[in-house]
């Protein structure tokens, strides 16, 4: 499975692509950070992000996009910009019929470090080890994008099993309701 990990942001947007192997083996294929000027108009900054992300999707052909889920932090403007960047990325994926999954920061940290409260340095260190990189990915947005992709690769089998179980439960519920309806008639 090829996963594109995205750490959305208006000033810096981390992008990565990794390929999953057998078991928990993952291989980094590409990583970068899109930067937009803070003094540029919002719609132009989003366009820069959109154009770059679309190029990455067309070049790398990911099977799925893993995006960090935005949460309200102390700065509402930062959260808003991050959410807008994430929306542009999700839209680009939808146009290409690529599945999108959102993961919380604590989910990602727990997946790669074993600790949902790990700091940036711990995440970067573990990403470097897991992917057997020669150098630590910088800035932190690059490491976070790789961590998101790793998290999704490792969680994908569980996500698929949960979806299958939910589908089975929905089918069983539908059959049961049809049986009840027939019994009442």
Swiss-Prot record:
Mg(2+) 1 binds at residues 7, 141. One of its GO terms (biological process) is DNA recombination. InterPro entries: RNaseH-like_sf, RNaseH_sf, X-over_junc_endoDNase_Mg_BS, X-over_junc_endoDNase_RuvC. It is found in: Cytoplasm. It is an enzyme of class 3 (hydrolase). Keywords: Cytoplasm, DNA damage, DNA recombination, DNA repair, DNA-binding, Endonuclease, Hydrolase, Magnesium, Metal-binding, Nuclease. The keyword Coiled coil does not apply. Belongs to the RuvC family. Homodimer which binds Holliday junction (HJ) DNA. The HJ becomes 2-fold symmetrical on binding to RuvC with unstacked arms; it has a different conformation from HJ DNA in complex with RuvA. In the full resolvosome a probable DNA-RuvA(4)-RuvB(12)-RuvC(2) complex forms which resolves the HJ. This is Crossover junction endodeoxyribonuclease RuvC. The lineage of its organism: Bacteria, Bacillati, Actinomycetota, Actinomycetes, Mycobacteriales.
């Amino acid at each position: 499975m090829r996963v594109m990990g995205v750490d959305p942001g208006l000033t810096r947007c981390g992008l990565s692509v990794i390929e999953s192997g057998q078991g928990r083996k993952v291989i980094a294929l590409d990583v970068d950070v899109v930067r937009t000027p803070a003094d540029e108009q919002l719609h132009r900054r989003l366009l820069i992000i959109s154009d770059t992300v679309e190029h990455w999707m067309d070049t790398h052909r990911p099977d799925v996009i893993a995006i960090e889920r935005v949460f309200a932090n102390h700065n509402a403007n930062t959260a808003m910009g991050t959410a807008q960047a994430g929306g542009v990325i999700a839209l680009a994926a939808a146009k290409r019929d690529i599945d999108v999954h959102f993961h919380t920061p604590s989910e990602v940290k727990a997946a790669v470090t074993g600790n949902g409260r790990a700091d940036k340095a711990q995440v970067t260190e573990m990403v470097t080890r897991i992917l057997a990189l020669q150098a630590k990915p910088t800035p932190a947005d690059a490491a976070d994008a790789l961590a998101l992709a790793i998290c999704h690769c490792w969680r994908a089998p569980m996500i698929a099993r949960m979806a299958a179980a939910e589908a089975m439960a929905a089918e069983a519920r539908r059959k049961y309701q049809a049986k009840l309806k027939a019994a009442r008639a």
